């Protein structure tokens, strides 16, 4: 042990700053959130209440609505973004190297924009007045304008649609790079057997991309659970009758508008447990021993 420490001591020293930042800015806040979730914590006082905050959440219709909205948003958006990223990457893969580089940059470019700015653009598109872009297009083809984010029945659908139509550039780049490393021998063997383009894509490309798909699935799910700025900007923090409220939005308002830090921490703990549980299920379902 002593010899190993002397041999690798410098390595530990280089890792130490990153580990310290992780402890201070990630691990300690998580521990503090778990501790606060068991207290009736406000700005000037704190009282131990055990699991009462979680009981309050179970009985709160607004939290149940936020939970349902978060789950629905995540299911639709994650499935759509994974599919879009895979399809777009598959379409640009047969192109030449320069064309691939151009399209990868083109689809990745929106990621460098501010999420708030992107949400503001979508708010203008789905503006409920007749001058919103979506209603202008509907009017041009003879349809009546919709209320979109101004309606409790349509607001969540508009938010989900805005996320779905935002092609995930990061996924396109990762899928495209992974496709470039797939063994050509498998495709050549399939061509000898008379396999068509779709057959090769479905039975060779998609299965071999399972590690990349698993990574993107976990990342996209966590990001979907954490959706905040899109809802906050497009629907003013929840929309009509809390139609678009999500768990993170409710955590924000509960903590920083009403000062109920204990209850907000309980919501954050529920979201954390959800994310971990879903990630475990995803890893168990999609983990693969594929090597190439």
Describe every region a protein language model picked out.
Residues 7-292:
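A structural signal for multi-pass alpha-helical bundles of membrane permease subunits
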